[in-house]
């Protein structure tokens, strides 16, 4: 069952028609900045993949992908993508991208096992991007520089929206604050991972939390990550404080991708060394794919944030429990 946060005295500043205009305004402006800041080319991407390819994102390892049988191929199963994290790296090679060049695409996914709430939906829409880097640039400096480029696009978008709409005030700080998961755990040793994220994000306004997926000194990871795309020592989430809901809102997840050594180590830690036999993972181990950095940026979350909406269902179409839909409507939250 979804947990619904009802902000006190909430009222959307935009009706349904004007909300659609606002969504397009946010997406068009931010996308143009992202392309320019990261040197990206838009490409077509798959909605589904062959599960035998190892190309789908296993996320935290327990989410079930949506699959279906293809009649023409004797009901051979295909899986709807959960993200394009692995496919993008493969595409950079196949499409002939050079050092410093990257791609981006609109990624639509179905997360059937998602626990829904104000910011989570079973429908996921994001800009998925990936860029070729040199092996010597697989370091925290490259990660931080890229985070700053993405954050710069976010800030400029907020400034633009504040000009377009009188009710929107700028709340993002000038600079984003960087911290590792271990530093965060040391700062708040008695709190849960989500509580730590909330405290640091509310204090700083915008935070980049780095090194996600590996176990901390207390034996627990800050958050889950699949072992075969991000290098757990070189990845990050961008979170901003969202006063409408009084939460830390994750807008983007990114990372420098695994090389041969990182992949072997992380598959061992995750207890899934059998994945090394899949085609995509074999290509990494055989050093056939380029070194890359990439990530995903939530389209609906960005629209929700910049339009100051209380629920992600105000900016995307999905299916919600009927009682949640009724309660939301009773409090001025119009779900699409």
Predicted regions and their residues:
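A general structural signal for short secondary-structure junctions and capping/turn motifs
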Residues: 68-71, 93-99, 119-121, 169, ...
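N-terminal pre-domains immediately preceding structured catalytic cores
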Residues: 50-61, 170-179, 321
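Generic recognition of stable, solvent-exposed alpha-helical segments in well-folded globular domains
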Residues: 21-25, 29, 138-145, 149, ...
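Class II aminoacyl-tRNA synthetase-like tRNA-binding/catalytic domains
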Residues: 2-120, 128-132
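Extracellular structured ligand-interaction cores
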Residues: 101-103, 124-128, 204-206, 246-248
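Extended, charged alpha-beta segments that form solvent-exposed binding/catalytic grooves
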Residues: 105-193
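A translation/RNA-centric and nucleic-acid-associated enzymatic feature enriched
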Residues: 110, 180-336
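A generic secondary-structure signal for well-formed alpha-helical elements
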Residues: 34-41, 150-161, 310
């Amino acid at each position: 069952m979804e947990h619904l946060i009802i902000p006190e005295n909430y009222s959307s500043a935009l009706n349904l028609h004007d909300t659609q205009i606002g969504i397009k305004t946010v997406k068009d402006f931010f996308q143009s900045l992202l392309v320019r800041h990261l040197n990206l080319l838009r490409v077509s991407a798959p909605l589904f993949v062959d599960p035998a390819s190892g190309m789908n994102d296993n996320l935290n390892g327990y989410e079930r992908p949506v699959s279906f049988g293809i009649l023409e191929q004797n009901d051979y199963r295909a899986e709807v993508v959960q993200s394009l994290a692995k496919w993008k790296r493969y595409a950079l090679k196949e499409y002939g991208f050079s050092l410093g060049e990257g791609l981006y695409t609109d990624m639509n996914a179905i997360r059937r096992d998602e626990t829904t709430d104000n910011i989570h939906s079973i429908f996921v829409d994001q800009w998925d991007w990936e860029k070729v880097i040199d092996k010597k640039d697989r370091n925290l400096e490259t990660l931080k520089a890229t985070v700053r480029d993405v954050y710069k696009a976010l800030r400029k978008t907020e400034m633009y929206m504040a000009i377009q709409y009188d009710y929107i005030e700028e709340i993002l700080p000038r600079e984003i604050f960087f911290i590792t998961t271990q530093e965060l755990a040391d700062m708040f040793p008695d709190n849960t991972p989500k509580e730590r994220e909330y405290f640091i994000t509310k204090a700083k306004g915008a935070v980049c939390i780095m090194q996600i997926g590996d176990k901390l000194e207390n034996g627990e990871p800050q958050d889950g990550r699949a072992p075969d795309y991000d290098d757990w020592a070189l990845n990050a989430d961008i979170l901003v404080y969202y006063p409408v809901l009084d939460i830390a809102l994750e807008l983007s997840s990114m990372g420098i991708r695994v090389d041969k050594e990182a992949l072997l180590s992380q598959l061992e830690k995750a207890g899934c060394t059998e994945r090394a036999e899949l085609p995509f993972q074999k290509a990494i181990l055989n050093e056939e794919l380029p070194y890359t950095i990439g990530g995903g940026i939530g389209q609906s979350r960005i629209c929700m944030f910049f339009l100051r909406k209380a629920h992600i269902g105000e900016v995307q179409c999905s299916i919600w429990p009927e009682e949640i839909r009724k309660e939301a409507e009773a409090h001025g939250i119009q779900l699409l």
